[in-house]
Amino acid sequence: MSRASMRSGCVWGLTAILTGAVVITARPWRTPAAAWSRAALTSTFDSGIRNLVAEWDPEDRRPAAVRRQALFDFMYETYDASAWIPQSLFDTNVMTQAIVGDVDTIVGDKVGLVLWRDNPKVPAFGMAPNADADAPLRWTVNCLVCHTAEIDGRAYFGAGSKTFDELWLGTALKQLTNERWRGRLAGRPEDRALAANANRILNAHHHDKIDSLSRARSTAFAASHVEMFMRAHDGAMPPIEAVGRGDVKTPPLWHTAAKMQAGRWYTDGSFHGPFPLMASSMELEKDRSFEALATIVVPKIKSEFESVIRHLRPPRYPYPIDDALAARGRELFYSQDIGCHRCHGTYDGRGNVQWPGVHVDVGTDRSRLDVVSTDFIAAFDASPLAVEGSLVHSRGYAATPLTGVWANFPYLHNGSVPTLHHLLGPVSERPRLFEILAARRLDRERVGQPLYADPRDGLIAPTERLERFGENRDWFNSTRPGCANIGHDFWPAIRTDANRRALIEYLKTL
C-alpha cells in the first residue's frame, strides 16, 4: 500500500490507518492541548461517577458534600508528581502506526486500565492530569490504576485491578519518551524536558525482579526493597539474588476497615502500624527522595486513609441470591467441621467483620513471604517509613477478610485460583492456566472469572493450550515461580458439591 493510498488520523498519538477497504475506527481523543482547571474537572465529576460502584460506611456521618470532595481529591490525586508525560508527545507520535490504533484497545486491553466512559476529560481511571489551565496538558498515574476493576461492564472503586499491565505500560512509555520520539516536539522545550525526565526515571529504576510474570499481578514489595536499597547505597541496585520473586494480586481497599483492627497490613501482615504506608514507597519508583516521601507522600496517604479508604465498604453482589441456600451455607461456614470463621472472622451481613487477624501457613506458595528478607528489613529501617511502623518477618499469609469476596477474584494471595468453586474444591482440579483478560466478566455459577475470554480456547487440549499460551503475559500460568495454586485445601471438610454450592451462595452475601 503506497503512502498516497492511505490517510491517517492521530488519536492520542495512536494512529488509525484508513483505506478504501478497511477502517480501523477509534474513539476521538477527548482532550485539548491545554490542561483544565480544578474547577473544570469538578464540574463534570458528578456525571463522571454516576455509574461507578462505590460503597460507603453507613456510619460515616460527614455531609455528602464533604464525602464527595474527598472522593474527588482521591481520584485526581497526583502526589505532586515528579514524573509527567506531556500530552503533546501523544499528539505528535506516529510510533503506533503498525499496531491497532483504537484508543479503547490500547488503554483498555493493552495497558489494561478501566475505561472511564462517563468522563469527558479523562479516558481511564488512574490517569491524572495536571489541574492548571495555564500550563500545557500532561499526565501521571495514581492509586486507581491498581485499585479499580471492571466487572460485567461496571467500574468498581477500590477493587484490585484484574487486568492492568504495568510492564506493558512502562515499556511503551520508555519508547514513547526516548530521544527519537521526543525530538519531534519542536518548539516545545518544556515538554521535551518533561519527556526526557520521564525517560530517565523509567530507565534508572528498572530491576529484573520487579517485572511481574503476568499482567494484573503486583511486585510492589520487591520494588520497595529495590528502591529503599538504592537510597541506602548511593543509587546502587541490589543484586538479583537478594530480591525475592513475589507476584501478588492487588487487594481491595475495602479490606482496610477490617485490617485496622489488627494493625497488620498486606498479604503477609509484615507491616505493622496504624496505616498501610508501605504503599507510599511505590512513589520512590518515580524518583522521589526519602525527604519527599516523608514530607509529601506519606502525609497525603494518611489524609486519604482518613477521608476515603477507611470508610469504604464492599460492593453488594449484583445478582439474585438464593436465600435458603445461603442460609445453609452460613451454617456450614460457622460449623465445627468446616469453621471458616476461625480464621476469616464473623460477619454481620452489612459489610462489616470482626476479623481475628490470623496469619498462618496453609500450604500456599511461599515466594511472597520470602520477599521480606533480612536485607529488605534493613533497607526499610533506614527509610522514613521506619518511624511510621515496622517491617517484620511473617509466619504466613493473612486469612483475608471475606467482605466483598465475590468481587475479589481470582483467589489466594497470588491470584492463582480463578473461582470460589475451584478454591473450595479438590486442589487437583484447579486449572493450571487461565486467561487474565477474562476477569472482566463474572462467572455467576462458580463465582469468579471465566477461564477464557474466548470460549473456543476451552476446546484446545490442555497440553497444547499450555504450549501455546504458557509464556503469554495475558494468561496466568500456575507453573511459573511464585504462581503455584497449591494450599488452602479444605475439600476433605467440605466433602460434597452440595456443601460447596451452599458455601458459595453464603459468601455472595458478605
Segments the model singles out, each with a brief description of its role:
Residues 25-510:
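Periplasmic c-type cytochrome electron-transfer domains
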Residues 2-15:
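N-terminal Sec-pathway targeting helices
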Residues 12-19, 402:
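Hydrophobic alpha-helical targeting segments used for export or membrane insertion
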